[in-house]
Amino acid sequence: MQLNKLCNIEDWDRDARAATMRRILPYLPKAHTEFPKGMEHRKHWEFAQILDGLDQLNALPSDGLVLGVAAGHEEVLYDLTNRVRWVFATDIYGIGAFAGYEAAHTMLQDPDSFARCPHNRNRLVVQYMDALDLRHEDETFDAVYSLSSIEHFGAEAGAMTALDEQRRVVKQGGIVAFTTEVIVNDAPSLDVPDLTLFRSEQLADMCQRLPGLELVEPIDFSMSDRTLANVTTMEQAQADAQRSYVAYPQIVMELQGRQFTSVAIFLRRTA
């Protein structure tokens, strides 16, 4: 399976990918028996791509330690407790733009209340921590991951600082995996408060400049015509969310003339 790639609707055609989504989001097939068919959402893809990729790279030993950066209370955290010895969830819980929903302060006191998939509650540690200053020792973790987070850390400089911190705390030979937003049309990059949309060339260059990290494979930035056939504006998505509605497929988004989607990137620590 290609790991470093854009989200494409054809990824939902793989039975193994559908099985991962159904495992980590069990409440969705209960309500929609055909899930994920007909409910193609890039966030579900991010979850599954990271989990399947870490598994493919043998980065989840049974006695391993995994760190989630800016992890909120996403299902990936809980699913990983079934695979490794310890999972550390870190975020600025209760503070910032996501405090009201994805990073609620109550996650620090009662992580069980956010669990929506089977998990081992004795293997999850939740910590308040800034992604730009990870308070862990060097070479602690077998894998470090973040999901659609680095684009919120203060443009390219903040993203690079965060990824270098992740490199520092992962073991030699360990994996740093992340998803972020990448522009798929010819528009320039975008920096607005709390959000950066990267150009593919910019993101590839950033990965090449990260000291001590190497891509596990080249990044495939190709996107199918079938995927590009449906574009949802951010304004429409936000309006739909107000009435608890999602227009599927929700893979390619548009903001200020930039069409963008999710990309997954896996790097290995080499130094």
Residue ranges and their predicted role:
Residues 2-60:
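Class I SAM-dependent methyltransferase Rossmann-like catalytic core
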Residues 145-152, 181:
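Short catalytic micro-motifs in class I SAM-dependent methyltransferases
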Residues 222-271:
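A C-terminal cap/extension of S-adenosyl-L-methionine-dependent methyltransferases
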Residues 173-181:
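Conserved beta-strand signature within the Rossmann-like core of class I S-adenosyl-L-methionine
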Residues 129-144:
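A short acidic, Gly/Pro-enriched loop at the edge of an enzyme's catalytic core
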Residues 187-222:
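Conserved Class I S-adenosyl-L-methionine
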Residues 153-165:
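A short, conserved alpha-helix within the catalytic core of class I
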